[in-house]
Structure formats: C-alpha cells, structure tokens
Amino acid sequence: MTTLVLRAKRWLYLLHRWMGVGLCLLFVLWFASGVVMMYVGYPKLTPAERLAHLPWLDAAQVRLGPAQALRAAGLEQAAEIRLAASRAGQPFYAIVPLAGGRTLRVDAASGQLAGRATPAQARASALAYFGARHAAREGGLVDEDAHTHTRTLDAHRPLYVFEMDDPARTRLYVSSSTGEVVRDAPRLERGWNYVGAWLHWLYPLRGAYWHDIVVWLSVLGVALTVSGTVVGLWRWRFARPYASGSRSPYRERFMRWHHIAGLLFAATTLTWIFSGLMSMNPWQVFGTRATQLDRAAYRGGAAARGLDAGRHHAGLRAGRLAP
C-alpha cells in the first residue's frame, strides 16, 4: 500500500512538472491577452458609432411611408422597421420579418426591393460613413478575417473591405447583402485585437475542431492547477519547519517563490481557468430542453398597425433628419 502511495505521488509530481512545461507559455499568453481584452475589446460597430456616422436623412427624398414599404417587401407584419440613409447615402427602409430571417431593404424613394449591394454601392457607403471627407481604397471581398469572427455578421458575408484615409486609418467592412457599413476597425484597435481577443480565443485555430481544442486545453489547465495545489500542500510543512527553518523544502529562490505563490493563488488560478472552460459550454452541460420563447406572441400586435399615421417619425429611429 505504501509503495502504491509513493508511486502515485511520484506520478503526480511528474504530471504537474511536464504539464507545466508544456502549457506554461499558453497560459501566460491567455492571461496577458485577457488583460488586454479588459481595456480593448473585439472590433465592433456600436449603435452609437453607427448613428453618429449616418448621413443626414433628407425627408424630401422619402416617397414611401412605412406601411407602403412593408407592402413593397411583400409582408403584412414586421418585427422592426427602420429608415436610414445607410446604403450609399440613400434612404432605405430596413425591415425585419416577424418570422425572422434576412433583413429586407426597400428603397424609400422608388419603393423597389433592393438586391445585393454592388461594389459601387459599397464604396459609396464607405465614403458616406465619413461624410465623403476621406478617400477609400478598396480591399476586395472577404468572407471572414481576424476582425470579423462573429455570428452576427453571417447574414452580411461576404464583406466588402475599404481602407479609409482618415487619421485613425480605419478599415470599414460593408455588407454585400445590405450595402451598409457593419464594422469599423481603426488601425490601433486592429493591432490590439491581435494581442487581445484574436490570441485569447485562439482564432488561428478556428475550424471544425476549434471548440474541442479550447475545451481540452482548459481541462488540462484545470488538471495542472489541481495537481500543483495537491503537490504544494504535500510539500508544505504545517507542523514544524524543515532544517533550513523554512516550511518550503526548496532552497532555490525561484522554486521557493513558485511553491509559495502557487499556494497563495491556487484558488484564483483554478476559478479563472474553470470559468473559461464553462464559458465554452463543454459537452452542452448548460443545454436545455425547455420550450423556446414564442417571440411573435411576446412582441404583440402587428408592426404595420397605424404606421402611415406617423409617416415621418415612426420609421426614423436610426436616421438623422436634414435641417
């Protein structure tokens, strides 16, 4: 029995040592990139930024009321209707069907249902984003890159890319579906993204096995922390110190520092790694079979009810009226 215990202890020591050698750099990068993310998030176009960069909306160009736009889209009801000069600087209605799905665009002047954006329309949207004050250099079409890893952009792919000549050297991504700017990424934000979210979420490994890779690396991190805590407690003298007078057996400064710091921050490190593991919802542990919320019933009545009564204010929530 004693032999088995000693052998188990030896294997635990070896496990902690070599797992630490193999994973130390990864977890240092994970920690450092997480600190970066606390101050510089993943690039995104916030509602405030979008509203601030919308061109002035000239009410004289709006020939259709919201209800007419709804009929032009072939719908009787909608979950949401917005009017803004978001496509090539021209006024368009954005209509979200009540049943969900792709957002429809209706030209507020002609009543035509808009198709996919052309390169010329995408370029006009990019120029209008800065009020035509800066030149735009075309960067082609991309399906996904380091700054557009998000499910919210799936309906807009592929994306037109434009490098703007503004002081911040902003990169604009324009939806090929709607023709509106859906993401802005200044050069400084792009740079921090590479050492922040891009590195933290292991985006270079994104693919069919990305989720499993992150989950199992986190599991190994939990095992590394638990084994180190157990070994650290075994080696710590609670009753009487070692001959050196220290309660840690290690004479080398680095080893003694590692032993003491490991015990002090074991709980913090374990909860940090474990919370990251749980954020990935491993093996669907947070799955539910509960009945999905009936969103249509939750929203209530039809969005088209009484829309024409407030033609020039009901649909202008996302636009700015010209003086």
Task: Describe the predicted segments one by one.
Residues 2-323:
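Conserved histidines in hydrophobic membrane contexts and catalytic metal-binding motifs
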